[in-house]
Amino acid sequence: MRTLIFATPSSGSTDFKSNLCKRNEYDLNFGEILNERTFKKKLSRNIIDNEEWKIFCEENSALNYTEQLAQFQIKRFTESKNCIAKLFPDHLHLLNIDLILKYCSKLCEVADKIFYLQRENKKEQIVSRSVRFIEGEPDKELMYSYKGDLSNDILNENFEHYRKYLNIIEKVFKNHPGQVVTLERDIEDTTAEGRYVYKGDWELPEELPILK
């Protein structure tokens, strides 16, 4: 069975995937399937066949790197009969929205089981991402070590990030429905102790999509 977890950051996807992997014996664990950084690490360790990737790039040289990676990973996901992957649409941020929708939809088309993860408390989700990316590169440990404030500009920037990608997920969900998993109701929170707490007065400029 090809299992796909479609989510945005800070929605409980790490614990959720870990629990699925404990209950199921997958032949292949893609992790974050379209994450360029982890993809390159797997290439360097030869977890992904370098020669296969090289040939694929040569055959698809008209595509940019992000599309090459997306098509290559979709091909591998399709060919695997028993695998699990996490899909974060923001890993395709260099592409336009139509292409992001295209590649996310292609993965959903070939998945046998799709879990759509979401978080009801969008404000906390935005705060979480704001802290993790406060130094540029994502760092989960900052949720426990960062003691500074968050400006409204940073929070508004992350709000726009989530608005873009949650709207994309909502569009894909309408054409490729799956099981909705909500962090607050369906996933045990094991990371609350010592976690950063926002004490400012920023609020969401508008409501963000909730899948039902």
Where are these regions (language model features)?
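A general structural motif
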Residues: E79-N82, V110-D112
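C-terminal accessory extensions appended to soluble enzyme cores
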Residues: T191-K212
